[in-house]
């Protein structure tokens, strides 16, 4: 199957699979979909609460986005829904601009994702450096962790306390630590212990579901004074309904930055999840179709009252381990959650808030990637470590928009510095090598000078062109460009200045082995016509021979 094809992979599976193959696989996908729904249920509720919205909105997201992305997506096994990466972003948007702002930002993100897919930009995600993704992921993990301490300890804040930013949350924690509720701590610790130890008991039943059941049972059984979801939220059961909030052009303009952030994060998370899944099932996803599906799924989610969604690595891994191999598993997972929403959602009111906090603490720990973080700090270059730490810090102190923007800017600057340092300009008068261009030792006439440029000629290194000099007796200057893969406008300007310098000193300029892109740039700039087509020689031997011939003709003419 073509990786860059803009066609849902489900359609290709149905078209190219035999009836016998489908008959064997579909039952496995149905079972896997049910298992994944069990995993997704507590996570969807917990992540919705962490995002500052109602618990049922997490299920809306898993149902609508989960179904649409599975149906239209480019991955066989991707499971999409609310993820921890979006929690802090969504919470900030909802706190400042309400659900209308979130809808506007997500629609912007959805349109961007669809366009990215249709324009086949899926492969561009690989240009986001590992240091940036590691830094902001660890930063998000810290913000989630800080945000759950209040509920884990059962703290009580005075009315009007603002806790949107991480720094505000830390200040509020310090100011109200004396209000700790030890009964809430007990529930939270028990649930954390279950989450850590349950995988040793059973890998089939998710520990988060067991923690929810045990936590919900502890509060009434022991008469504990602990806040539950029902104490803080109004639970709404029933089918999600299509909503069209009033959105103004000004609101879309205000939410543009948030929309771009959601789109970038959704693209990175979803395609990373696809890559991880591909490595397990030995398959290949269609990155561009996956982006289109993510865009449609996100727009559908918010129009049905949900929040942004993306591919969830943990749920996708659960799908793979359970035998899911087609998008039918993701669609079944959404259908099962829909049944839970309609018939069992009122029971979610019994879940204690410390249980939700415990689940999110485990999510934060798992997504932090602290081992990779520490490994990078110990082994990466100083520039890479600086980018990592700065992205991490800015994510916590400010927001993801600032972190990614600054991180990418620093990465680009460091990359240009590295490339410019690798570009060299060196002169020679006698040179020998054994490459395919050279078959003999080069002896240069005294009046011929050669400079060799190795590396891309762009604005980061053009100052080195000014280091080229000629002697009083120099008549011909050969610029060997076989090691120049690319030439930009600033590099072109440097060559024009070099030409003027040579003209002022009575020196003829010759170019040797200009590669395709630099040659095309010089032609477009009119530089080839200025210097003369005959002065561009195919290799260094030909250039030296041309200079020698010109010198001989000048001597005869004299």
Language-model region placement:
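Conserved SAM-binding loop
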Residues: 79, 511, 536
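The feature marks cytosolic C-terminal regulatory regions of anion transporters and related permeases
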Residues: 366-530, 548-558
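Short acidic-hydrophobic, aromatic-tinged amphipathic segments that line or gate anion-handling sites
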Residues: 530-546
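Transmembrane helical cores of multi-pass ion-transport proteins
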Residues: 1-430, 445, 473, 494, ...
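Short secondary-structure capping/turn micro-motifs that flank functional sites
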Residues: 335, 518-519, 538
């Amino acid at each position: 199957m073509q990786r860059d094809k803009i066609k849902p992979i489900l359609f290709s599976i149905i078209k190219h699979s035999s009836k016998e193959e489908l008959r064997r696989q579909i039952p496995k996908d149905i079972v896997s979909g049910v298992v994944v729904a069990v995993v997704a249920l507590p996570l969807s509720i917990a992540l919705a609460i962490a995002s500052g919205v109602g618990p049922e909105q997490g299920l809306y997201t898993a149902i609508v986005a989960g179904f649409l992305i599975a149906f239209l997506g480019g991955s066989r096994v991707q499971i999409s829904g609310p993820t921890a990466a979006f929690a802090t972003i969504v919470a900030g948007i909802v706190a400042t601009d309400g659900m209308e702002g979130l809808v506007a930002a997500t629609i912007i993100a959805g349109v961007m994702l669809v366009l990215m897919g249709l324009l086949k930009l899926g492969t561009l995600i690989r240009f986001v450096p590992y240091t940036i993704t590691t830094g902001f992921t660890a930063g998000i993990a810290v913000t989630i962790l800080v945000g759950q301490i209040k509920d884990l300890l059962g703290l009580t804040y005075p009315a009007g306390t603002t806790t949107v930013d991480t720094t505000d949350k830390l200040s509020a924690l310090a100011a109200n630590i004396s209000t700790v509720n030890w009964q809430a701590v007990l529930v939270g610790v028990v649930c954390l212990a279950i989450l850590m130890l349950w995988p040793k008991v059973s890998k089939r039943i998710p520990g988060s579901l067991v923690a929810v059941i045990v936590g919900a049972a502890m509060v009434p059984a022991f008469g504990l004074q602990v806040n539950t979801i029902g104490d803080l939220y109004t639970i709404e059961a029933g089918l999600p309904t299509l909503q069209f909030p009033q959105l103004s052009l000004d609101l879309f303009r205000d939410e543009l930055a948030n929309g771009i952030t959601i789109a970038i994060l959704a693209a990175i998370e979803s395609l990373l999840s696809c890559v991880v899944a591909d490595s397990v099932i030995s398959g290949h996803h269609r990155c561009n179709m996956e982006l289109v599906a993510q865009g449609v799924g996100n727009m559908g989610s918010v129009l049905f009252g949900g929040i942004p969604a993306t591919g969830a690595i943990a749920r996708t891994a659960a799908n793979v381990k359970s035998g899911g191999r087609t998008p039918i598993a993701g669609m079944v997972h959404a259908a099962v959650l829909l049944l839970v929403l309609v018939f069992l959602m009122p029971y979610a009111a019994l879940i204690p808030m410390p249980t939700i906090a415990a689940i999110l603490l485990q999510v934060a720990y798992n997504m932090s990637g602290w081992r990779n973080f520490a490994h990078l700090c110990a082994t990466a270059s100083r520039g890479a470590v600086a980018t990592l730490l700065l992205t991490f810090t800015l994510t916590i102190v400010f927001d993801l928009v600032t972190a990614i923007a600054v991180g990418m800017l620093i990465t680009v600057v460091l990359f240009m510095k590295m490339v410019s340092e690798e570009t060299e300009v060196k002169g020679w008068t006698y040179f020998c090598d054994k490459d395919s261009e050279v078959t003999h030792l080069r002896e240069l006439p005294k009046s011929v000078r050669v400079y060799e440029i190795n590396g891309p000629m762009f604005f980061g290194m053009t100052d080195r062109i000014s280091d080229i000099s000629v002697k009083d007796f120099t008549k011909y200057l050969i610029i060997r460009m076989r090691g120049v893969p690319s030439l930009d406008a600033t590099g072109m300007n440097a060559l024009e200045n070099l030409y003027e310098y040579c003209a002022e000193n009575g020196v003829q300029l010759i170019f040797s082995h200009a590669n395709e892109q630099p040659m095309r740039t010089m032609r477009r700039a009119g530089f080839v016509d200025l210097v003369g087509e005959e002065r561009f020689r195919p290799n260094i031997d030909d250039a030296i021979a041309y200079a020698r011939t010109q010198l001989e003709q000048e001597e005869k003419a004299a």
